[in-house]
């Protein structure tokens, strides 16, 4: 990667599903050997806290240690499944357990409270809960470039207004209280 950076073919690179320890080790190696360090990470983060990973080897950065690490280093985060597998689209209902991966990874009382709060703020701001979920990511205290994987074009249409939604510190805290 370093040769491509030096040749100007890329301007930044990083890791996906890497632990923060592995990321730091790679950057220590880069520094010790005069190479370009990693500047971005693609691990999971969403307003809905994940309780399991969809596949072996996946990494989250929702824990306090990872959040502090991101704030301190200002590493750009490209969170995959930033819409929590459609949790905020209306697909997630406590009584509907037909999507076993959604249930395994995201169903919890805490996340359904977050969904209710996202719905409340969405109604007040004239957007959908998916837009609030996107705005929450964009208001983190480090660079975030959320990756969404909509199943339908309607999910893109309801999410993108989140690019313009402003959330106060109080609203950010309310969503995760």
Residue map of PLM features:
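Beta/alpha (TIM)-barrel catalytic core signal, keyed to glycine-rich beta->alpha loops juxtaposed to Asp/Glu
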Residues: 1-176
């Amino acid at each position: 990667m370093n040769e491509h950076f030096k040749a100007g073919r890329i301007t930044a690179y990083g890791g996906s599903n890497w632990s923060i320890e592995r990321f730091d080790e790679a950057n220590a190696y880069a520094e010790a050997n005069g190479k370009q360090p990693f500047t971005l990470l693609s691990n999971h983060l969403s307003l809905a806290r994940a309780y399991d990973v969809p596949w072996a080897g996946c990494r989250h950065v929702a824990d306090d240690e990872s959040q502090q690490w991101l704030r301190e280093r200002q590493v750009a985060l490209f969170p995959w499944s930033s819409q929590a597998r459609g949790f905020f689209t209306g697909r997630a209902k406590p009584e509907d357990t037909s999507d076993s991966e959604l249930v395994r990874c995201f169903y919890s009382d805490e996340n359904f409270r977050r969904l209710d709060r996202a719905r409340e703020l969405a109604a007040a701001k004239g957007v959908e809960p998916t837009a609030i979920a996107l705005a929450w990511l964009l208001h983190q205290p480090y660079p975030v470039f959320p990756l969404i994987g909509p199943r339908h074009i309607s999910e893109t249409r309801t999410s993108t207004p989140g690019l313009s939604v402003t959330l106060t510190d109080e609203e950010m805290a309310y969503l995760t209280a």
